[in-house]
Amino acid sequence: MSFLNTIRGLGRGSKKNKKDLEPSNNAIYSHSNLSGNGLRRTQSPTKFSPSKLSSKGAQGSAAYTSSPTKRSRTGQSLQHQDSQSSLQYQQQSGSVSPSKRSSIQTTKSTTVNADPPLFLCEPYVKTALVKGSFKTIVQLPKYVDYCEWLALNIFELFNHLNRFYGVIQEYATPEAYPTMNAGPNTNYLWVNSSGQAVNLPACQYIEYVITWVTNKLNDQSVFPTKNGGAFPPNFIKDCKNISRQMFRIFAHIYHNHFDKIIHLSLEAHWNSFFAHFISFVKEFNLIDRTEMEPLLPLIENFEQQGKITQASK
């Protein structure tokens, strides 16, 4: 793993610069089917500007009343407040920022004896690029600053996720995926600048997330890279929000595009990457287990295989 073979620049020395944070082309999840160009801290990975995305998302938003961090399912509903902040698209300034509130609405599905999703079927569920647990490579190394380690890993993981999404992006059309769903029973909604929850096409939701995360990573006041820069008091909160939105992209791809991943012979890379991501967010408590529900059967399967360390009881 390129970013784990060296922790160059983590000491916040005078030689540290943005080039140290750029991903290597020899990263473990690199593949001939993936783009060779990694995300740079000064580049936006989106094809559309935030202002264009905003104008697209504004149409018809008045018809929706749900929260962007809600997970809706058919059947009986249950609602509770979540302390994590949801994302809010700022149409006035053309940028994305988190809102101060979010809620989760869950309902239990009455569907029984349904066929398991493809990613839970043999042999795909056991396919992996790396064997063994990822715990040892996500743990905080000795003499490394806690926030530096979080920042470096989030940057690397987001870069890899963005590249994987680029592989299946052409299939994620608004017509094919009119909602940001993670299976038939889970749907993610987006809170706009007016506080309204809108049901966006998956591609637009993901573009909003990518734009927001990219802006965070490029913001020196949030993810400082210059010598002497201090991490802000809400840095951990930003890490949690970024990790939560990254998980939703994982969930959408697993439930809707895993067949394309298989067709491109990337299932081993994808499974190992997801196991790595979950190991990292579990190690630093960045995502609540309730938020992982759309992929919880897969996570528990990986735990049984030893790819992810099970939580101590």
Swiss-Prot record:
Interacts with protein kinase CBK1 to form the RAM CBK1-MOB2 kinase complex. This is CBK1 kinase activator protein MOB2. Phosphorylated by CDC28 at Ser-44, Ser-51, Ser-67, and Ser-97. Phosphorylation occurs during bud emergence and is maintained until the G2/M transition. Dephosphorylated at the end of mitosis. Phosphorylation is required for the maintenance of polarisome components in hyphae. The keyword Transmembrane does not apply. Disruption phenotype: Leads to hypersensitivity to cell-wall- or membrane-perturbing agents, cell-separation defects, a multinucleate phenotype, and loss of cell polarity. The lineage of its organism: Eukaryota, Fungi, Dikarya, Ascomycota, Saccharomycotina. Residues 76-97 have a biased composition (Low complexity). Residues 1-109 are annotated as: Disordered. One of its GO terms (biological process) is septum digestion after cytokinesis. GO terms for molecular function: protein kinase activator activity; protein kinase activity. Disulfide bonds: none annotated. The modification Phosphoserine is found at residues 44, 51, 67, 97. It is found in: Nucleus; Cytoplasm. Transmembrane segments: none annotated. The keyword Phosphoprotein applies. SMART domains: Mob1_phocein (SM01388). It comes from Candida albicans (strain SC5314 / ATCC MYA-2876) (Yeast). Belongs to the MOB1/phocein family. Signal peptide: none annotated.
